[in-house]
Amino acid sequence: MKQIFVVYETDAWHSTSHRDCAGVFTSKWAAVNAIVKNHRIELDEFFDDEEIEKTSKRVLEAEVRRRLRKELEFAYQTQGYETNYDIEVWNINEWYLAKY
């Protein structure tokens, strides 16, 4: 059985009516990397204004990537942001792939 990992970008409430497919991947690692590299979560959702002013944008972005990667390590979704990401795992039978 093969698995594919479908990433959805959604709103703060994970509602299905505001959910867009952001990509399809062959591994969870690839899906997490895509979210971490291409997320649309603002820095002010992670840090207060004082921290943003004192620290370089590059350092802040690296910390955001680390936090997202850690959050997605066990869970298949982000929570608590204005824009969230869900990872769905789809199991596909081998016979289906061979047939089509």
How would you name each of these model-derived features?
Residues 17, 33, 97:
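Short acidic, gly/pro-rich beta-turn/loop elements at beta-sheet edges
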Residues 19, 28-31, 59, 72:
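Short, intrinsically disordered, low-complexity terminal segments
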Residues 37-100:
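Short, mixed-charge low-complexity intrinsically disordered segments
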Residues 8-11, 26, 91:
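Residue-level signal for short segments within beta-strands and strand-turn junctions
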Residues 23-31, 35-37:
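GIY-YIG-like beta-to-alpha core
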Residues 22-23, 75:
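Small side chains
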